[in-house]
Amino acid sequence: MSNGENGHNLGNAAHLHANVTRRRVLRWSAAGGAVGLGATLLSSKPWRAALADAKPYKLGTEQPLTGVAAYGGKSSLVGVQMAVDRINKSGGINGRPVELVVADDQSKPDTGRRAVEKLATEDGIDFHVGGFLSNICLACTPVWEEHKIVNMIGVCLDTTLTTSKCSRYTFRTFDFAPAQAKAFAPYLVRQIGKKWHILYADYSWGQSTRDAYTAEIKANGGEVVGSTGIPLGTADTTSFLSKIGGDFDGLFLIFFGSDAINVVNQGTDLGLAKKYKFAGDGAVATSTQLPAMGNKIEGFVGIDRYLPVFDAPLDTPELHSFFDEALGRLKKVDPSGPLPDRYVQSNFEAVNALKLGVEKSGFQGRNDTPKLIEALEGLTMKAGPDFPTGDKVLRKDDHQVFMRELIYVIKDGTYHVQQAVSWDQTLVPPACHFPAA
């Protein structure tokens, strides 16, 4: 895998790397303040002394803080840290504080596997929230199973994680491609055009997302006339893009980070945006990437679970509060001030879902993992400060959440919501078969 990075998006990644490669564990501050990533906020409430003396829960988080996905790892870590700080400020979980152990997977599956093995053995974590690149999530699944540790996925979107390769120990508290495709395909076919060519990142997430959209576009009367995979980290994509042509209506893009920037910018320079409508997964146009694409992303139609705007139905107190706090935290690690994105949101809500499960199960340590799994299966999450994107249910059959989807268009450099699709309109049948307990 390439380790090429987009400098604009990485922001202060080097600073983050310096703070986390020592695998720092969050420690209590007697003064009740926090400094950078190495401390946790405490308030001066009466329970403060008792909370500080209680045995902490150890929460591990594996993130790509260097390498091709570093920009997303930065946002993801902000989401985890934000949730942990809020939990500790409000009294912890079951009267116990939460300590965070951070590991850098360097955007590499082998490094990621070694990192989570160390989290499980040497660091002795109780549970885990994180994972960005799907190939790394898949590589780490056996570690969670071997050590019987609950794993709340932070970002990984590969379809198989909650279908053919599902695990009793792994949960995804946000959407996935089959649900997005079911929500988006009718709009693509009826509002844009019937014939599509799919351009995708040629690894597990891109491939499974390609398959999901191919199926749903066909189910809605459309046609996928071709597909083109581009390896991760390809700086010059023109050799792939220049071969695309023919009679079809739209190019559906499945990329993230610098790869998305390269495909959009280079594809526009080749004239593809004049010939075909650009649409795609929301990862193509996250808020951290928009500046690097400028007006070349104008008119792009995408789908996402979270957008940093307040068009209806997003103008809620919970989303305003989430936005304001996340924005302030992002500015501390990247002075350019990137807006909150889907990666902050999904990691933030994953920690809060885990908190509910720990409270419900009375989890005390890894021996209680079966109780925690049972508490998380079918867990109901209600819209509010902990779940600003709205109500959702964690399905027992496959440990997959379904949630509201937002179809948007990029105009004048920002998002404009065109349609909100309720979670119940995104449901797909479970395709997971857990091994016998």
What annotation goes with each model-predicted range?
Residues 114, 159-160, 167-270, 313-321:
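Extracellular/periplasmic Venus flytrap/periplasmic-binding protein
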Residues 1-24:
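N-terminal secretory signal peptides
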Residues 17-18, 24-46:
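N-terminal export signals
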Residues 329-344, 348, 355-417, 436:
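Segments of small-molecule ligand-sensing domains
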